[in-house]
Structures are given as structure tokens and as C-alpha cells.
Amino acid sequence: DSIENVKAKIQDKEGIPPDQQRLIFAGKQLEDGRTLSDYNIQKESTLHLVLRLRGGMQIFVKTLTGKTITLEVEPSDSIENVKAKIQDKEGIPPDQQRLIFAGKQLEDGRTLSDYNIQKESTLHLVLRLRGGQ
């Protein structure tokens, strides 16, 4: 079964639209395009369902290699928080990440809404080399 499929079943049973569902297993958020077996989820496993608030939105982060990562965020999320989400997905430590939006480097202590970053905005991720400035 795909994760989308599981969300559709939850909608049938509970009436919760899939776009408001976040499924978590072993501390990881499950992505729609993947299957239960991709995450090694077996029978009798327990998934956690977290409801996404209406304020939730997706933003995109483009890396220098041209890869685009999709993140689920809230406007109130701090830049540190966004870097932690990138670390979860990509394994890049936050202290090596520099995030750029509209030509500005984003500061950890600020929030997405401070920078007027709205849904479907694209941030650019630049890696800071170890020992570099």
C-alpha cells in the first residue's frame, strides 16, 4: 500500500482529508509517494497521525545540485526549525546550511513570516563548507 492509499482509508473511516494528515512512523514523516514496505512497516505496526493545521503550507528548497525538496511548514516556524527539517530529509547538519530567499540570507532566530515567505515559496540552500565562513 502507498502512503496516499493509507491516508485515503483514514479519510474513509475518520473523515479527515488527506492533505491535513501527517503520518509518522519511528519518528519519520511518511511521504505520499512511498509505500509501507519502503518504511519497513509491518503488520501490527502503529503509525501516528498528526493533523496539519490549516495554517500549514508547503515550501520548496532548491539545492545547488538542482534537487528540490518539499517541506511542510507553518508561517510561525523559525529558520532553525526549517534547517532541522532539511536535516531530517537530507542529513545536512544545520550549521552547514545557509538559506537564501529573495537574495537575502535567512537568520536562525527569525520566522518564515518575518521574511514574508508564503506557501509554495522557493528557498535556496547553499552549503557552508566546514571551516569556511
UniProtKB/Swiss-Prot annotation:
Keywords (alphabetical) are: Cytoplasm, Isopeptide bond, Nucleus, Repeat, Ubl conjugation
Q: Name one GO cellular component term.
A: nucleus
Q: Which residues form the propeptide?
A: 133
Quote the InterPro entries the UniProt record gives. Ubiquitin-like_dom (IPR000626), Ubiquitin-like_domsf (IPR029071), Ubiquitin_CS (IPR019954), Ubiquitin_dom (IPR019956), Ubiquitin_ubiquitin-like (IPR050158)
Report the SUPFAM superfamilies cross-referenced here: Ubiquitin-like
Residue span, Ubiquitin-like domain: 1-56, 57-132
Family under the similarity heading: Belongs to the ubiquitin family.
Its biological purpose is as follows:
Ubiquitin exists either covalently attached to another protein, or free (unanchored). When covalently bound, it is conjugated to target proteins via an isopeptide bond either as a monomer (monoubiquitin), a polymer linked via different Lys residues of the ubiquitin (polyubiquitin chains) or a linear polymer linked via the initiator Met of the ubiquitin (linear polyubiquitin chains).
- Miscellaneous field: For the sake of clarity sequence features are annotated only for the first chain, and are not repeated for each of the following chains.
Q: Under which name does UniProt file this protein?
A: Polyubiquitin
| Organism (species) | Strongylocentrotus purpuratus (Purple sea urchin)
